[in-house]
Amino acid sequence: MTRVSLSPLAWLDEVETQRRAAGLRRTVRTRPPVGAELDLASNDYLGLSQHPRVIDGGVSALRTWGAGSTGSRLVTGNTELHEAFEDVLAAFVGAESALVFSSGYTANLGAVVALSGPGSLLVSDANTHASLVDACRLSRARVVVTPHNDTAAVEQALATRSEARAVVVTDSVFSADGDLAPLRALHTACRKHGALLIVDEAHGLGVRGDGGRGLLDEVGLAGAPDLVMTTTLSKALGSQGGVVLGPAAVRAHLIDTARPFIFDTGLAPAAVGAAFAALQVLIDEPWRAQRVLDHAATLASICDVTEVPSSAVVSVILGEPEVAFAAAAACLDRGVRVGCFRPPTVPAGTSRLRLTARASLSEDEMTLARRVLTEVLSPR
């Protein structure tokens, strides 16, 4: 007979003890005011979260439309600002249409679930973001997870399927390692087998492609009729929110069926206004995208990472969680905040420092980064 605990939450103490012993306990830390420490951990790739035009864009929207959207976009949460931003962003990346969600996470949930469902096949890369993993789980489709960037495995899954409809999902730039998906090969496989390709450009927008238009633009797939792009407004555009971009028929279908769009409060006007202003800055200053890659290459060199980064992300693999955590703490003690990725975010034995480059890093900040990272990581 199973012993029933009288305390329904008693098991939490046990699993917390296990996480602590494994070096996997997480804490929520407050972020100091801007300038108090050097930030090499955030996803503010273009340095726009503090840009005066971006802040003004958020404040102007706040004063015009109020603090919140006040409801679902299908009720009271839609404004002219939302729709104008969608039009400009779609034109920028070469898509026919766009639909703003409250976050990149909900954009992925909405797109994947609404475009798959029972009786369809979902093929997902093993390293896709957690939001895509959760979307696959919620879809009620049959899910096949393929080895990382293994196009042959994707094609095999598509070729042997019994389902009429199939969807392949991938990041364009993978968040932990910063490596790129083989988008041309994936699209070729999808087109051959009549599958839809959904690409999350969260880490590609603003960094890859012509003037930051994303990796899809770079490989010549922008606006493809059998492809859907998702992205976030919380990284290169320095705000928050998410977007699904693609054919107009997809937008119409999501408005009718995507539960995170229908039942969630619309993205706050201030966030839309800030993202809109950030997009205008990127359009006016396309050099920012290359600056990110240049700084990432410098950070990789400082950390003895031999492979030239393909994105803003530089991963310094240290092995065990305790080692990575101690190195991150040592950097912070010296005034530099870096990311620390441990399982389950990354596989066991690959805990790492995750550095992110920003277009706005100054020469003095890069000098500080060099000094601190050299002190902490040498010898390894």
From Swiss-Prot:
Binding site for substrate: 26, 129, 345
InterPro entries documented for this protein: Aminotrans_II_pyridoxalP_BS, Aminotransferase_I/II_large, AON_synthase_class-II, PyrdxlP-dep_Trfase, PyrdxlP-dep_Trfase_major, PyrdxlP-dep_Trfase_small
Modified positions (N6-(pyridoxal phosphate)lysine) in chain numbering: 235
Pathway per the UniProt entry: Cofactor biosynthesis; biotin biosynthesis
Transmembrane stretches, start-end: none
Record's keyword terms, sorted: Acyltransferase, Biotin biosynthesis, Pyridoxal phosphate, Transferase
Assembly: Homodimer.
Annotated organism of origin: Mycolicibacterium vanbaalenii (strain DSM 7251 / JCM 13017 / BCRC 16820 / KCTC 9966 / NRRL B-24157 / PYR-1) (Mycobacterium vanbaalenii)
Superkingdom of origin organism: Bacteria
EC number of the protein: 2.3.1.47
Protein's name according to its UniProt entry: 8-amino-7-oxononanoate synthase
Binding site for pyridoxal 5'-phosphate: 104-105, 175, 200-203, 232-235
Pfam families in alphabetical order: Aminotran_1_2
Cofactor: pyridoxal 5'-phosphate
Tagged with keyword Transferase: yes
Gene3D superfamilies, A to Z: Aspartate Aminotransferase, domain 1 (3.90.1150.10), Type I PLP-dependent aspartate aminotransferase-like (Major domain) (3.40.640.10)
Example GO molecular function: 8-amino-7-oxononanoate synthase activity
Biological role stated in the UniProt entry: Catalyzes the decarboxylative condensation of pimeloyl-[acyl-carrier protein] and L-alanine to produce 8-amino-7-oxononanoate (AON), [acyl-carrier protein], and carbon dioxide.
One Gene Ontology term from the biological process aspect of the record: biotin biosynthetic process
Catalyzed reaction equations: 6-carboxyhexanoyl-[ACP] + L-alanine + H(+) = (8S)-8-amino-7-oxononanoate + holo-[ACP] + CO2
Family (UniProt): Belongs to the class-II pyridoxal-phosphate-dependent aminotransferase family. BioF subfamily.
